[in-house]
């Protein structure tokens, strides 16, 4: 379990005292300009045994030089700061939203970039592998884990953990297929389902009565984790910098509900029946033997099979 902090969103404001722009927490009243939200959350994660990760938006609607090679260097310097100053980072989250309207350097403008080539993402992968080799890299196409193709928190009922290598990139236009993965893929890129506990990603007091209920959150769990994906649940902090009490209570009770529903393994010890199996080494018993290294498999010429449990 871990926390992913939005260290910089599309607006370009940095929640850490970066040395690269004045548009950051250093120039706010918070702690008289001595604050560092990234540091505070990283330290809290260490204290409570939670993994820490960062979201860094490639798109920056504030920087005057966005769309030029100089901005790309700026972006990588920011990434370097986050990778080297806050201890272990378990995931780096790159958004696929890039280019568009903004107040670039104070001038209202629209910028267009080539999403496939502009950021030179192999440079990011190399930097992350060198500085945080254990970190999972998230983007539309990974390479560590992928976007699921929607922001509603669910994966397809059939969801392959594979993509065709080199085909999907941040800003990939055929993103809806990411909900299912590629059955003929050759690169392991598991899906991550992102969704907010509220109607949107940011806090609005008028939405205090529209927080997802325990039942709604439980349904999302089964349609994400239950569909071979991970669940990333967004919590918009309120104007006091806190998670609203309703959001917090619903999340805690959601966790309790899942624990209660899954406390007993209904299939443990059962001997299922199958329409086909590849000998004793890959028999149906492997499904319920509680051993992650064993599995049921069919013969090579069988592409459709059934498994039946008698409860």
Model-derived features: positions:
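Extended extracellular/luminal ectodomain segments enriched in beta-structured repeat modules
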Residues: 302-304
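Mature catalytic domains of secreted/periplasmic carbohydrate-active enzymes
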Residues: 1-288, 295, 299-300, 309
């Amino acid at each position: 379990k871990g926390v992913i902090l939005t260290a910089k969103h599309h607006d370009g404001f940095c929640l850490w005292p970066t040395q690269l722009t004045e548009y950051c927490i250093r120039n706010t009243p918070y702690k008289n300009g001595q604050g560092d939200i990234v540091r505070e959350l990283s330290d809290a994660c260490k204290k409570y045994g939670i993994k820490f990760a960062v979201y860094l938006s490639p798109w920056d609607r504030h920087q005057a030089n966005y769309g030029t090679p100089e901005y790309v260097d700026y972006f990588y310097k920011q990434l370097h700061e986050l990778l080297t100053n806050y201890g272990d980072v378990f995931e780096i989250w790159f958004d696929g939203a890039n280019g568009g309207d903004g107040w670039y350097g104070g001038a209202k403008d629209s910028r267009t970039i080539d999403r496939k080539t502009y950021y030179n993402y192999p440079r990011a992968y190399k930097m992350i592998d060198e500085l945080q080799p254990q970190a999972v890299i998230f983007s539309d196409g990974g390479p560590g884990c992928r976007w699921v193709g929607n922001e509603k928190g669910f994966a397809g009922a059939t969801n392959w953990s594979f993509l065709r290598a080199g085909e999907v990139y941040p800003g990939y236009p055929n993103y809806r297929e990411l909900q299912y993965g590629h059955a003929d893929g050759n690169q392991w890129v598991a899906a991550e389902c992102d969704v907010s506990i509220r109607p949107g990603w940011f806090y609005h007091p008028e939405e205090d009565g529209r927080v997802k209920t325990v039942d709604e959150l439980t349904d999302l769990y089964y349609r994400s984790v239950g569909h071979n994906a991970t669940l990333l649940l967004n919590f918009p902090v309120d104007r006091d910098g806190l998670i609203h009490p309703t959001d917090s209570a619903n999340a805690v009770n959601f966790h309790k509900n899942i624990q209660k529903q899954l406390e007993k393994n209904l299939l443990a010890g059962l001997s299922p029946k199958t329409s086909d199996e590849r000998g004793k080494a890959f028999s149906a018993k492997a499904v319920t033997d509680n051993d992650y290294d064993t599995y049921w498999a069919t013969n090579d010429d069988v592409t459709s099979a059934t498994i039946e449990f008698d409860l």
